C-alpha cells in the first residue's frame, strides 16, 4: 500500500498500465472509475471527464459506474451492487479508480476473485474506516469501538491510496481571524459517510484548538 499526493494520479495510472504493455497483452486497456456516491456533483463529473479525456489521448478507454453507497439500506442491496459489477465486467478492467473508501468496503470482494490482482487506486482515503459493512450502512458516527485502521481493509491487495486533507483547523482559524468575536460556528453537511467524518474533524478541531 502506498500513500501519495492526489496530483500524481495520472502517473500512477500510467504506471499500473505499463506492465500490461510490457507483457505484450491486449492493447484494449480499460480503466473503470467507481464513485462511492454518483457523478451528479460538478467536481465528480469534471474529475471523471478529465480522467476519461486524458486516458483517451493515450488510447486507453475509461468507463464510470455510480455505486450510490449512501442509499444502500442493507447488505442485500450492497451484494446486488457487487453482483451487477461482476456480471457487467467479467473481463477484469486493467485498473480501477475508486472515489471514496465506502466503495472499496462494498466492492473489495471483487478483488478476491473475478478482479483478483487488478491494481486499484482509492481517492479521498481516510486513516480509520468502519469496522464492517454493517457499520458503514448504519451511518453511525465512527468511534474507536466501531472503526479500524484503514490498513485492515487494504492489506493484501494491489492498492494505492490518495489522501485528502480537509484543513478543518486552518479554515476555522481563518474564519476566527476574520470574525474575532465569533462564538458559534455552523457546519452544514449531509448524511454521507465523508460528511460524517468531516463533521468529526471539525468538532475535534474546535474542541482542541478553540475551546472558548
Report each predicted region and the residues it spans.
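Bacterial N-terminal signal peptides
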Residues: 6-16
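Short hydrophobic alpha-helices and adjacent helix-cap/hinge residues
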Residues: 4, 17-212
Amino acid at each position: 500500500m502506498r500513500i501519495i499526493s492526489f496530483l500524481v494520479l495520472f502517473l500512477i495510472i500510467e504506471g499500473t498500465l505499463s506492465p500490461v504493455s510490457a507483457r505484450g497483452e491486449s492493447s484494449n486497456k480499460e480503466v473503470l472509475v467507481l464513485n462511492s456516491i454518483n457523478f451528479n456533483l460538478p467536481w465528480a463529473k469534471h474529475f471523471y471527464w478529465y480522467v476519461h479525456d486524458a486516458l483517451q489521448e493515450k488510447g486507453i478507454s475509461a468507463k464510470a459506474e455510480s455505486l450510490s453507497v449512501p442509499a444502500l439500506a442493507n447488505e442485500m442491496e450492497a451484494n446486488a451492487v457487487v453482483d451487477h459489477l461482476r456480471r457487467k465486467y467479467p473481463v477484469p478492467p486493467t485498473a480501477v479508480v475508486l472515489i471514496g473508501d465506502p466503495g472499496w468496503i462494498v466492492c473489495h470482494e471483487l478483488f478476491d476473485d473475478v478482479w483478483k490482482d487488478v491494481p486499484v487506486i482509492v481517492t479521498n482515503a481516510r486513516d480509520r474506516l468502519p469496522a464492517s459493512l454493517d457499520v458503514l450502512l448504519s451511518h453511525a458516527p465512527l468511534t474507536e469501538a466501531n472503526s479500524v485502521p484503514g490498513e485492515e481493509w487494504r492489506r493484501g491487495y494491489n492498492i494505492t491510496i490518495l489522501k485528502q486533507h480537509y484543513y478543518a483547523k486552518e479554515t476555522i482559524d481563518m474564519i476566527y481571524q476574520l470574525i474575532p468575536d465569533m462564538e458559534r460556528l455552523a457546519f452544514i453537511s449531509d448524511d454521507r459517510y465523508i460528511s460524517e467524518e468531516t463533521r468529526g474533524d471539525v468538532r475535534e478541531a474546535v474542541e482542541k484548538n478553540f475551546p472558548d
